[in-house]
């Protein structure tokens, strides 16, 4: 989130700077400086602005390039984080504090093993938050050699969007796929299920979808089988 987005959100509500400053508990002068980029927006302020101005979770701050994976995700409750971002499969967990969906998606894709229900929610993140910071996401996915996993998630998201007749969303996702295509890795991987047996791996090499084969992933996940595909 930057000053331009802050100003756009204020104008969207037809508020003057004085009205917004009162709601955000800052002075009008300080709000003006933030909108002009002369003062930084703290995380605490951004979280308040999200609620007051009804901004999407994509406005939440992202970690620096160096710190994107600095904190271990092994204790992350990804089901709760998906629920907090509105994923219907975990709607009963929506009370959790939200994080930027690009950060949640990246950290989940970097996990060696995920609950299958969580893995199924990752294409939903890409589809629902199609306007997330893709430059940040793709850069960091490439740093950790996770671009194939990301490409597969985006491929399923595009497939589901097309099935829902969401042409503009599908178009955006296809444009991101083109970027990921240029960075596609030749080595075999799984879609966050590294603990599968050799027998399972052999079976999946023969029975995976064309999309999974294209991204060199061993998985039986298909867009048509996702619970939200027909919503």
Please place each PLM-identified region on the residue numbering.
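DNA major-groove recognition helix of helix-turn-helix/homeodomain DNA-binding modules
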Residues: 44-59
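Recognition helix of helix-turn-helix/homeodomain-like DNA-binding domains
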Residues: 24-40, 62-65
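The DNA-contacting recognition helix of HTH DNA-binding domains
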Residues: 17-18, 28, 39, 57
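Helix-turn-helix/homeodomain-like alpha-helical modules used for DNA recognition
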Residues: 67-131
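Small-residue-rich helix-loop
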Residues: 144-175
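Short basic helix-loop element that most often maps to the first helix and adjoining turn
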Residues: 4-23
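Charge-dense, extended regions
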Residues: 167-231
